[in-house]
């Protein structure tokens, strides 16, 4: 998949930031020699910090580790090869030496550091929306583009439905039907009343999931409902590591009691699409695929172009005009300035 080309200034900034990071690593990193380490073993990254990561071994034990300088990137969910130290040094118990190939990853564009992976090896993205202040189908569509491009199954969750009167609920269900019609799964839930929380919990038991959505939609309430001991677990890990408590900006993978894993990633609150080109965004709309390539002109912009098969499908009721309009809003946003094109969900 082709990626948007960075400008010379962006490239220079990325190189400068990388150099500064390497310098910091040299100052803080422990030099692990071979005789200081045990045998290689498999593990999963459950938390990533600036120069450390917490790795869970096959027995469920968590160790804080350094990263080899040869590792280009490391995120929560990565499957790794690591070695435990014969003794703990400065609160660090071992070193990560290699990363297994990822099945998939979620990344967000960063103007200064390029495309930054957030999490890897995900089975399902839970797109959380809420009825208040307003339901934004445009934001849902942005997340769905990411899901389609990454090849990750989405679940659209509408939270706080307990705030809806029956008539309002019917209106919301009618709006969301455009997603059901093209094969997306939707769940109307309430963390407060417990409506459909059992169904959500059952779906989360199937693999590894990550929650995404705007601030205020109730992601934290959902996580606390599903995993009420989450804060206690964070505290326990900090005490065990001896390195003190990290801020809540760190992503973390949690094991759910009923099975499955949940990644809580505050970094997912900011989500831009400016690293994608128009062709990639078009491929992110699954219902467009059966008409693409059938337009009269190869360079069709799918607007007022004569013989546009996509526009004709909208006029015939085969494609939702709401989704079609949101698609063009996304395409138009690609040409916006830096301050405008960084899509913030905070």
UniProtKB/Swiss-Prot annotation:
Q: What class of enzyme is it?
A: hydrolase
Query: Which InterPro entries does its entry note?
Result: G_CP_dom, NA-bd_OB-fold, P-loop_NTPase, Ribosome_biogen_GTPase_RsgA, RsgA_GTPase_dom
Q: Spell out the molecular function terms from Gene Ontology.
A: GTP binding; GTPase activity; metal ion binding; rRNA binding
Which intervals carry biased composition (Polar residues)? 7-20
Q: What is its EC number?
A: 3.6.1.-
Binding site residues for Zn(2+)? 295, 300, 302, 308
Q: What is this protein identified as?
A: Small ribosomal subunit biogenesis GTPase RsgA
Upper lineage ranks?
Answer: Bacteria, Pseudomonadati, Pseudomonadota, Gammaproteobacteria, Pasteurellales
